Amino acid sequence: MSSRGYPCTPNNIKQVMFPADHCIILPNPRGTAPGCIMEKNGKAAILMPGPPWEMEPMFEEEVVPYLQKRSNCMFHSRTIRIFGKGESQVEYAIKDIVDAQSNPTIAPYAKAAETTLRITARCGSEEEGEKLIQPVMQAIEDRVGEFIYSTHGREMHEVCAELLKASGLKIAVAESCTGGMIASRLISVPGSSEWFMEGAVTYSCDSKMRRLGVKAETLEKYTDVSAETAKEMADGIRLQSGADIGISTTGYAGPTGAPGLIGQVFIAVSTEEGCNAYEVNLKGNRERVRDGAVLNALNLLRKQIIAKNRCNLDINVL
């Protein structure tokens, strides 16, 4: 701490004090409080720091290997991510598979506008776990395969990043109601400079006209929340940036705005072959509407790349 110009307080010293005997210190490169494993009489107590960004890597890098050495078996999991089909619909579609589960087990989770299935096998090795999991995964894919976008737990923006990189396509984004959220998620992926050209937040009608070339007559006739406006936004950002794909969003995120239209969002995807706009109607508060719009836009991007056969990646590696 002194090398960083911080005083070492009594509290900091207390954080690094552990019993002298039967104690394994777990290093914490992300904080000042190490963890420890105390062993006695064939039992172990494991202590880790509370902040998740410190605890989670310590658990994965230090605790899991320790537990694996002490156990004759291990747990191996695969995570399936599903978009476009709700948790209850997914559960109904695979009910007989879930009812028949023993090893591996299936655990469904709902998150925002998507559903996650975690398949976990009790096994002696990772290879054995994969062999147990594969038939269950195949049975699930047979039921809801068209809605699966990842079988390795990758999030939607990570999948889109993999597809963009593999296809060699470049993207630019024009956002209104999502306010830069799509761009933010895409460029959170390392190496995004290879395929992300630019992002523009064009919230006002004036900025849509000035920055993207949206026509005044389009806004007058159809309003700023319309398929027509979304298409001109997507075309504008693609042409001005030189990208292969332009994505746009415009909508009513709420809670104020057009009565009865809160949650209405238009998303457009522009390529040199043409531009298509899609309407989605989302429920929930402002945050949920915006999150849903981002996921829908990324899903349309994912489908666009796959449909053009510009990439040889399939669901089994994503």
Model-assigned labels for residue ranges:
Residues E39-K40, L47-A113, R118-T120, E128-I133:
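Accessory alpha-helical/coil subdomains and C-terminal extensions
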Residues H22-I24, K43-I46, T79, P104-A107, ...:
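Structural motif
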Residues K40-G42, A112, C123-G124, S270-G274:
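Short acidic-glycine loop/turn motifs at beta-strand connectors
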Residues S2-Y6, C23, N41, E60, ...:
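Generic secondary-structure signature for well-ordered alpha-helical cores
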